[in-house]
Design a protein with these regions (language model features):
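Intrinsic low-complexity/IDR segments
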Residues: 2-54, 63, 68-70, 75-737
Length: 737
């Protein structure tokens, strides 16, 4: 018995010594965890946005924000592992102590007396305390404390780090945090049952004894990996395709609507930055804002879905940042940078020429797709090469902004102010440009196919006075009611475009291609159309007084009811052109009505943005002054009558017109601008010039329904084909006795 007692006392001493050391370690672990909870809890969305260093409490040390969220969980995990390791060693000693105690003292009363000599450390008392104390309140509280500090708190802290950092959107850090959470769960499964039961790590009891523990572990794993995701993350994209309900659950917890009053998200957490109504310009910078190149750098940041409505970010640098789905409504973004920079990758921005020496890598450009910048203040901002597809810029203030080579396909710029802006080579296909103010803007070589300018009607027309649209791609664009006085559209591609009731007084459309376009009742007084391609265009009721038609191609065009007084230059081709008999040569203003002319002229000039454009337009429309004599190059009524006489009539007209329409709408692949044939075909249906084929209209319709034999048929929509069938039916009714 003495030998057993001596051995027990040695084990008891070892247990107490170990308990004292583990207690110190445990307290240090709790303090460290609490320290991290406070540090992480102090991180705000503003700090994440500005990458503000984290100031550690007490130590007064600043740590880099990203570095902190990478290193802190790892250090904590190592500390956690070491603490579990020491607890397991203590647990093994306690198991040995219990076995030795039972052998040395068979009597329960003696064992109870010996147990009172153990260290009061909560964990020791739970594993080796007196039996009478174990069911008591003290024991229950001790178990709660140990479970919270060694199971709940560590997992909570690691999850807190992940959730707090999630809006920053850095996949490698988030995945590192997920791995650390999984590692913590593995450590728990390896050590905690062994610690609780005093076994080896490999001798864990069956899973059925830990159902709640297992369920909670699965829940934590599922939450960390599948629920706590952020917009644009690769995993989230996969889940959206294969398991949409998981994404819905994630949105419910992390992506709720934002309270416009408090500026806080309504969801429990947030996976995007929410910083409404905040200023990001330091007071010292505010005083010298004009002298600064930039106020804050956000280059290359992932800011997808960020809510920055009404934020003050003047002169901020977003070069190469990802702002897809972000909200910057009414934000102050004057002179902000949303452009491109080289990243060393070879891929270039779509739309850039391969021959250019300076290629902007697509991954080095700012992405602002499907974002909202409604009513944002963007005067002088730069969006060169930016990806703005589907973005809302309605009512945005973009005066003097640069959007050269910007990708704006499907974007909405309704009521936007773009006076003096540069949109050279911008991609604006199918964009909504209702009531946009483009006065003095430059849209050279801009791509505007099927863009919509006329949705605002005559009350809210798009304004292009004095704008430069040279070489612009405006095929199929809807420009009805647009104000284009003094605009330059040299070599512009306007096949199938709708310019009905458009104001083009004094505009320059030299060598523009308007085949199949609709210019019904357009105001073209004094416009220059030298070498313009107007084959198959409809200019019914157009005001062409004083227009310059030198070498203009008007084959198959309609000038029915058009006003042709003092038209100048001689059109090159007038075959199949529809002309009134007699020609409408009514003066715009009668002689001795110079006061009316001057008032009309002054109203036009007042809409132009600069003196240069005013001088140019004034010179072009001065030919309409009733007090001036006819110009020397006037196209007289006799000239128009001669052209009408040369045009075939009756059956010959229908046959030749049919061949002309088919050739125009079904340009061969080798023909110039054959890629624009679908726009021409659409335009001929829309402006109804196609009905000039008369009884041969079904033949034309048959051609337009054969994409293999007619390139123009490729782009025809279901609505176009329905309209074509309607025209054929209409023609059949006319010819049926």
């Amino acid at each position: 018995m003495a030998t057993d007692t001596g051995e027990l006392e040695a084990i008891e001493t070892a247990v107490n010594d170990s308990a004292g050391q583990v207690r110190v370690l445990w307290i240090a672990f709790i303090i460290f965890a609490t320290y991290l909870v406070i540090a992480v809890g102090s991180v705000t969305h503003r700090m994440l946005f500005l990458e503000t260093p984290i100031k550690l409490p007490v130590m007064d040390v600043d740590l880099p924000l990203v570095g902190f969220f990478m290193i802190a969980p790892f250090v904590f995990l190592i500390f956690y592992f070491y603490t579990l390791l020491q607890l397991h060693a203590l647990s093994r000693k306690l198991t040995l102590y219990n076995e030795t105690l039972t052998q040395a003292f068979p009597d329960a009363a003696d064992r109870r007396t010996r147990r009172h000599r153990l260290d009061p450390f909560a964990f020791v008392q739970l594993r080796a305390g007196t039996r009478e104390d174990r069911p008591g309140l003290t024991s229950v509280l001790s178990r709660i404390v140990t479970d919270i500090t060694m199971i709940g708190a560590p997992i909570f802290l690691l999850l807190e780090m992940q959730v707090v950092f999630l809006p920053y959107h850095m996949q490698r850090v988030t995945w590192l945090q997920r791995i650390e959470i999984v590692a913590a769960l593995v450590l728990l499964w390896c050590f905690w049952p062994a610690i609780r039961y005093g076994r080896d790590v490999v001798e864990n009891p069956p899973l059925r004894r830990h159902k709640i523990f297992f369920a909670c572990s699965i829940l934590v794993f599922f939450f960390s990996v599948f629920i706590a995701t952020f917009p644009g993350e690769a995993l989230r994209g996969i889940l959206a395709r294969v398991a949409p309900p998981i994404v819905l659950a994630s949105d419910f917890l992390f992506h709720g609507a934002v309270n416009e009053v408090t500026g806080a998200p309504r969801s429990w957490f947030s996976n995007v930055l929410v910083l409404m109504d905040q200023s990001f310009i330091d007071s010292d910078k505010l005083d010298r804002l004009d002298k600064l190149d930039r106020t804050v750098s956000l280059r290359g940041r992932d800011l997808r879905g960020a809510v920055l409505a009404r934020a003050d970010l003047r002169k901020a640098d977003f070069t190469g940042a990802n702002l897809n789905g972000a909200r910057l409504d009414e934000a102050k973004l004057n002179s902000a940078q949303f452009g491109c920079a080289k990243t060393g990758k070879s891929k270039s921005v779509p739309g850039y020429r391969e021959t250019e020496t300076f290629e902007m890598p697509v991954f080095g450009c700012t992405w602002i797709q499907n974002a909202s910048l409604t009513s944002a203040r963007l005067q002088g901002a730069s969006f060169e090469g930016a990806q703005l597809q589907g973005t809302k810029l309605n009512g945005a203030q973009l005066q003097g902004a640069s959007l050269e080579k910007a990708q704006l396909q499907g974007a909405s710029l309704e009521f936007a102010q773009l006076q003096g802006a540069s949109l050279n080579e911008a991609q604006l296909q199918r964009a909504s440009l209702v009531a946009v103010q483009f006065q003095g803007a430059s849209l050279i070589e801009a791509q505007l196919q099927r863009a919509d300018f006329d949705g605002g009607g005559p009350l809210f027309p798009a304004a292009f006075q004095g704008a430069s649209l040279n070489d612009a791609q405006l095929q199929g664009a809807k420009l009805r009611y647009a104000q284009l006085q003094g605009a330059t559209l040299r070599f512009a591609q306007l096949q199938g475009a709708v310019l009905d009731e458009t104001s083009l007084q004094g505009a320059e459309l030299d060598y523009a291609t308007l085949s199949g376009a609709s210019l019904n009742e357009a105001q073209l007084q004094g416009a220059s159309l030298i070498g313009a391609q107007l084959q198959g265009a409809s200019l019914r009721g157009a005001k062409l007084q004083g227009a310059l038609l030198k070498d203009t191609y008007l084959q198959g065009a309609s000038l029915a009811q058009a006003s042709l007084w003092r038209t100048r230059g001689h059109p090159k081709l007038l075959d199949f052109t529809t002309l009134n008999d007699p020609i409408n040569q009514t003066p715009l203003f009668e002689p001795l009505e110079s006061n009316k002319f001057e008032a009309w002229r002054d109203r036009i000039l007042a809409k132009l943005p600069d003196d240069e454009s005013r001088a140019t337009v004034n010179e072009r429309i001065s030919v309409l002054d009733p007090d001036k004599s006819d110009p020397s190059d006037i196209v007289s009524e006799t000239d128009w009558a001669e052209a009408r006489k040369k045009s075939p009539t009756g059956v010959a007209y229908e046959q030749q017109m049919t061949a002309f329409l088919i050739e125009l709408a079904c340009s061969s692949e080798d023909a110039p601008f054959s890629e624009h044939a679908p726009f021409v075909a659409h335009g001929l249906i829309y402006n109804r010039r196609i009905i000039e084929a008369g009884s041969h209209l079904p033949e034309v319709a048959e051609k337009l329904k054969d994409p293999k034999g007619c390139p123009g048929a490729v782009g025809l929509s279901a609505d176009d084909l329905a309209d074509l069938d309607s025209l054929v039916d209409e023609q059949k009714k006319k010819t049926t006795p």
